[in-house]
């Protein structure tokens, strides 16, 4: 007997989460099935809408103003700029720890590599570090955290022409942490704030850390730490360090695994549970039964068995080539669950550019849809009346070059989930 729901979302990344939240918010009995842990756990925690145009121009000042000029096949053009705005407002309502919603303009956020990233939304923990702020800045690295070289990042920011003086310093992290310790270990210690011994004196860990940074930070108006400043109470950790240092404190977004990404993932999955969405993770959807009327059943592989799941409406949010929502062999590129059409050249050597930094065709491989996000068949009609696609499984854009991945996931996830719920109510 099949496990039933009104809307079944396949995929646990930002697009899948947003789809499920939107469907549940619209009153649909919703279920989310995800094979792997959410890709948010490896994301920086920054939420981009559009940082650069497809031709490489940028940084884009106002991403919403740029959307009407994008190619017709771009997912933003499919859903429309008004839906993108509505979707970002929906995200804002479910992510209260994020800032940037006060303006349409992109913020410029320094990263751990010393680059400046245009982004539409950013964690509150990064707010005091914006590159548009001219306050003198100290970046702090830890000897046991090699992923953040504070001197290197400061030098890169200075060479990029930021409007503030910036320096870097590296200090030992108080307590007994081995090199390469997980970011969650740093965060857990800063949350717990245990007594630690520094130079023979016992003191709370947060105070001990501030003491080690204090001399270097004496002339700084703000101090940036790697993004490990607590998980349960990051605001409390930042406030305590700021009080001890007499300067604003912010986090510098890091590469994977990313604590801001983990925080966002945990928060959004909590929102799913609060909305009544049923969640199953760790088991892949491997096949589907379809008829001329649409998708009837999908099969989840669990402990060697194929468990049928049925719904009135389905959302495909399994990711792109990296997430295996799109796959390929030597002869073809394909979508493995529903066999949705993926437009590509028969010549596999045309899938990429000889220049490593060139315009690779594979970067835009994905499902092409109608204006309600239903995948098209070879004739351009909806392949399945009750199936919609969202996020990186979609084609027609290069999320890495454009810095548009999060925004496309939110906008198309919101549109797909809302449309799925509305289709049920219209029946």
Curated annotation (Swiss-Prot):
Q: Which domain of life is it from?
A: Archaea
This enzyme's EC code(s): 1.1.5.3
Q: Which GO terms describe its biological process?
A: glycerol catabolic process
Question: Family assignment?
Answer: Belongs to the anaerobic G-3-P dehydrogenase subunit B family.
Indicate the enzyme's highest-level EC class: oxidoreductase
What protein is this chain from? Probable anaerobic glycerol-3-phosphate dehydrogenase subunit B
The gene it comes from is glpB
Task: Write out the GO cellular component annotations.
Answer: glycerol-3-phosphate dehydrogenase (FAD) complex
User: What UniProt keywords apply to this chain's record, in alphabetical order?
Assistant: Flavoprotein, FMN, Oxidoreductase
HAMAP family this protein is in? Glycerol3P_GlpB
Output one GO MF annotation.
Answer: glycerol-3-phosphate dehydrogenase (quinone) activity
Q: Which cofactor does it need?
A: FMN
Q: In which pathway does it act?
A: Polyol metabolism; glycerol degradation via glycerol kinase pathway; glycerone phosphate from sn-glycerol 3-phosphate (anaerobic route): step 1/1
Q: Which reaction does it catalyse?
A: a quinone + sn-glycerol 3-phosphate = dihydroxyacetone phosphate + a quinol
